């Protein structure tokens, strides 16, 4: 794995808490650490890995990245050539979501939900949650509550409440924040 990385990439490590690292973190809309960003010689993003991956999965991902396979640009090119499926559309949406290009993620998640309505699909579930979250952040305070009430078995219910709490905490709406915490304690003891 290290040999492959040394042959195919020039690795630089920056700390997001230091000035230069923080600049890159903001420039590329990074969300959390660890956050591995793969850029070409012009500084254009090729792909990213967010979080930790098991070694085998990591090697497969970096091999794909080195070949520019299964990247956003690859998926978009395939989509434009007519390779249209739930997998391709979901992959594009998730790549945009990772980049925090939320309006573009909304576009593709909306296509996924409209054209491939399979409530048992993990992609469908993720798309529904993302769209509700985006609506909430965009000002519809009922979007996530509506999502939770209509999807009580969703694996994203806890995340929906957590997103509401963080939003209210960050916007210093203490009463709403405490109200959501209270609901969470009754639902997730």
Where are these regions (language model features)?
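Short solvent-exposed coil/turn linkers within tandem alpha-helical repeat scaffolds
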Residues: 49-52, 81-83, 99, 114-124, ...
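Non-catalytic, surface beta->alpha helical segment in thiol-disulfide oxidoreductase systems
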Residues: 30-71
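Solenoidal tandem-repeat scaffolds enriched in leucines and small polar residues
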Residues: 89, 95-122
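Alpha-helical repeat scaffolds
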Residues: 71-78, 103-114, 138-152, 174-186
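Structural register within alpha-helical repeat arrays
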Residues: 89-96, 126-131, 147, 163-164
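Thiol-based oxidoreductase modules, predominantly thioredoxin-like and allied folds used
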Residues: 1-20, 32, 38-39
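TPR-adjacent "capping" and linker segments in tetratricopeptide-repeat scaffold/adaptor proteins
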Residues: 65-88, 151-155
